[in-house]
Swiss-Prot record:
GO terms for molecular function: bis(5'-nucleosyl)-tetraphosphatase (symmetrical) activity. It comes from the Bacteria. This is Bis(5'-nucleosyl)-tetraphosphatase, symmetrical. The keyword NAD does not apply. The lineage of its organism: Bacteria, Pseudomonadati, Pseudomonadota, Gammaproteobacteria, Legionellales. It comes from Legionella pneumophila (strain Lens).
Length: 276
């Protein structure tokens, strides 16, 4: 009964099915961990959601920024971001709202002491130890799954505040927790988020670090599995930090990491021209 962590799918249903065939997935016994960004930009977000929703063994899911964007559209009155969104089919589906309510009750962080694994979409903020990260994930999850979710989704967008403080309260506190868990790539030496630069590591400004290389980063006792950052192509500088977004939608691959032995499996994704 192996566990597999699956990288960012982003509505790429066919590559997901090919990947599950490659790993000889047994839906009655195996457990899938989804690192988030199940939806958007790819052609089959509705099929992806329906498939994962129907799995007989409950999967572990950490929400990504595109998943939260869908929830903002469904429940927060958020406007369409632009022509790159491919969520209309979900929005118009008879079961779209049902799938949304299921999605908003998923996690920001999943962990297993037995497997020595913690998973979240973008990573763990350099300023947080594992206990702090778990507590803050639980705090945000309670809002997403509770009665005040409409208010949160209506106001979740924004780049400020951009650094964690225990003194933060209200929506500012929830927003920075959200941004660390779902949007983070680069931080400065003090752990401050930089959500503006999205280029390559080689061209990054000197004052910015990948979140897992920030000098003040607190050590996490477990191996970390994260997605969100296709440009890394599955590589990080740390042997216990596993990047599994390998750019399925952008001419790369869709990757699964078997958590028992950290072995990787990949299938080709879509070429960029697929959506031009």
């Amino acid at each position: 009964m192996p566990d597999y962590a699956i990288g960012d799918i982003q509505g790429c249903y066919d590559p997901l099915q090919r990947l599950l065939e490659l790993i000889d997935f047994n839906e009655k016994d195996d457990c899938l961990w989804f690192v988030g960004d199940l939806v958007n930009r790819g052609p089959d977000s509705l099929a992806v959601l329906r498939f994962i929703y129907s799995l007989p063994v409950k999967p572990k899911i950490t929400l990504g920024n595109h998943d939260l964007h869908l929830l903002g559209l469904l429940f927060g009155g958020q406007p369409w971001k632009g022509h790159d969104d491919t969520l209309e089919e979900v929005m118009l589906a008879d079961d779209g709202e049902e799938l949304g309510h299921w999605l908003r009750k998923q996690s920001l962080l999943c962990r297993s002491s037995e497997l020595n694994i913690v998973m979240c979409h973008a990573g763990i903020a350099p300023l947080w130890d594992l206990s702090k990260a778990v507590g803050l994930a639980n705090e945000l999850e309670a809002v997403l799954s509770g009665d005040s979710y409409h208010e949160f989704f209506a106001q979740m967008y924004g780049n400020k505040p951009d650094i964690w403080s225990d003194d933060l309260v209200g929506l500012d506190r929830l927003r920075v927790i959200t941004n660390y868990f779902t949007r983070m790539r680069y931080c400065d030496a003090h752990g401050r988020l930089d959500l503006g630069y999205k280029g390559t590591l080689s061209k990054a400004p000197n004052h910015l670090y990948p979140w897992f290389e920030v000098p003040c980063r607190k050590e996490i006792e477990m191996d970390i599995v994260f997605g969100h950052w296709a440009a890394l192509m599955g590589r990080s500088s740390h042997p216990r930090i596993h990047a599994i977004d390998t750019g399925c939608l952008w001419g790369g691959q869709l990757t699964a990491l078997r958590l028992q032995d950290r072995q990787r499996f990949s299938v080709p994704g879509y070429g960029v021209s697929r959506f031009e």
